[in-house]
Amino acid sequence: MKGIILHGGHGTRLRPLTHTGPKQLLPIANKPMSQFCLEAIFETGITEIAIIIGGVGSNKVREYYGDGNKFGVKITYIEQDEPRGIAHAIRLCKDFINNDKFLVFLGDNIIQKSITDFVKKFKNSDYDATVLLCEVDNPSRFGIADIENEKILKITEKPKNPTSNLAVTGIYLLTPLIFEIIDNLKPSWRNELEITDALDDLLRQNNNISFERITDYWKDTGTPEDIIHANGEIIKKMLENLENDHIIGKDTVIESNVKINGPVVIGDNCHISSGSSIGPNVSVGNNTTVAISNIENSIVMENCKINSSAEIKNSIIANNSDIKDDEGAKKIFLLGEGSKVSL
């Protein structure tokens, strides 16, 4: 089997964070979110992976992952010149896939459960596709599967009046038959080739699609709130088998009279000054300094300088940002790379 990671799109709901790079490189617990996808694929034994790139900062994806050697995989990069839908991106991989079964993983999806058993089951089955489903509270945001007697009846993309709460997650197990379906697919109202439409057409053609339920944590990180929530959940997972409620990187200095309220992860070569409070649910990237600041439920990326008497909550602060704030009130920041704030 082979793997595909979708790494394109404009990430408009995450601006200004995505003005300088793709959303899939935004960090969750100090690691690019798409790296969680790559590691999940590698865990299944798949080592040939195509990464679909396009849009702002595609070069950053190549720079970070390289040829894949340091991750134990072989990476092929495939360009999608414009965002024309998930099905279109998959179709671009036809030559790469050849006649193999394959796994597709959207690079902005975070899942805690191993997918190894799902992959093994599909590999040994005669199904043309397997979709992973998860119950959600807001089904109109997702492609939705209607199930009856443990069979998929239909799949609908972002229905206005959903008749099910089972979202089709961004993880698909497919065979090359899907390429024929996509070749005959008509664009949606968004002028995109929708993977949900392709799966629904495949379902009507031969009714040979299975599904698996995800009961552990899954998040489609489409908004800042989604990313912050995923950050907290992943840090909790990282700390499950550790005695401490936090992780501190090498050469990081934590002065006396600093409160760390886990779950928290702090990167390498950071400096947290006396009087600061970090956490809960906070990640701090490498080479960041925090002086007399209170940070909660937030992501602070690399090379930042935070000197704020305010309570910083529910915030995402991108690389190389500088905050100076003497006002002392509660603040929520959503800062793109290289931001300078003085209040």
Locate predicted features.
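Short internal beta-strands
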Residues: 48-54, 132-133, 299, 316
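Catalytic-core segments of class I nucleotidyltransferases/pyrophosphorylases
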Residues: 110, 119, 123, 152-239
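Conserved donor-nucleotide/metal-binding helix-loop-beta segment in metal-dependent transferases, i.e.
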Residues: 113-140
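Short acidic-glycine loop/turn motifs at beta-strand connectors
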Residues: 146-151
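Conserved N-terminal catalytic core of the sugar/cofactor nucleotidyltransferase
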Residues: 2-5, 13, 27, 31-105, ...
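A structural motif detector for beta-strand N-caps
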Residues: 246, 251-258, 264, 270-272, ...
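Active-site glycine-centered loops adjacent to acidic/histidine catalytic or metal-binding residues
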Residues: 9, 108, 135, 223
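Internal anion-binding site segments
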Residues: 223-245, 250-251, 256-257, 275
